[in-house]
């Protein structure tokens, strides 16, 4: 079975993949064997991954709040993730 691309996977899987890649980048940078240019490229990629992870966590928090608001249980609804098309 072919591996799904990042855009075809679930938000949780994308979060986990982004976090794993971010951790690998941090390890490479901590070793100190990267050139300045490689370090800058890794840093830029890391910032993008961090932002992706932060957004995924915010969406997860919103989903939990929508599903578990004790003050308004009648408003609990299934979460529909945003379209990845645009």
Curated annotation (Swiss-Prot):
Top enzyme category: hydrolase
Single biological process term from Gene Ontology: DNA catabolic process
Gene Ontology, cellular component aspect: cytosol; exodeoxyribonuclease VII complex
Region forming the signal peptide: none
Subcellular location: Cytoplasm
Pfam families assigned to the protein according to its UniProt record, in alphabetical order: Exonuc_VII_S
Chief localization: cytoplasm
Known catalytic reactions: Exonucleolytic cleavage in either 5'- to 3'- or 3'- to 5'-direction to yield nucleoside 5'-phosphates
Annotated GO MF terms: exodeoxyribonuclease VII activity
Record keywords, A-Z: Cytoplasm, Exonuclease, Hydrolase, Nuclease
HAMAP family linked: Exonuc_7_S (MF_00337)
Role description: Bidirectionally degrades single-stranded DNA into large acid-insoluble oligonucleotides, which are then degraded further into small acid-soluble oligonucleotides.
Similarity remark: Belongs to the XseB family.
Subunit structure: Heterooligomer composed of large and small subunits.
Protein name stated in the entry: Exodeoxyribonuclease 7 small subunit
Originating organism: Xanthomonas oryzae pv. oryzae (strain KACC10331 / KXO85)
């Amino acid at each position: 079975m072919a591996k799904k691309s990042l855009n075809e996977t679930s938000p949780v899987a994308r979060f986990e993949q982004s976090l794993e890649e971010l951790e690998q980048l941090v390890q490479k940078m901590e070793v100190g064997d990267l050139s300045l240019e490689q370090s800058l490229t890794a840093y830029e990629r890391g910032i993008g991954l961090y932002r992706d992870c932060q957004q995924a966590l915010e969406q997860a928090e919103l989903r939990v709040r929508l599903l578990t608001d004790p003050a308004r249980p009648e408003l609990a609804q299934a979460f529909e993730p945003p379209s990845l098309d645009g």
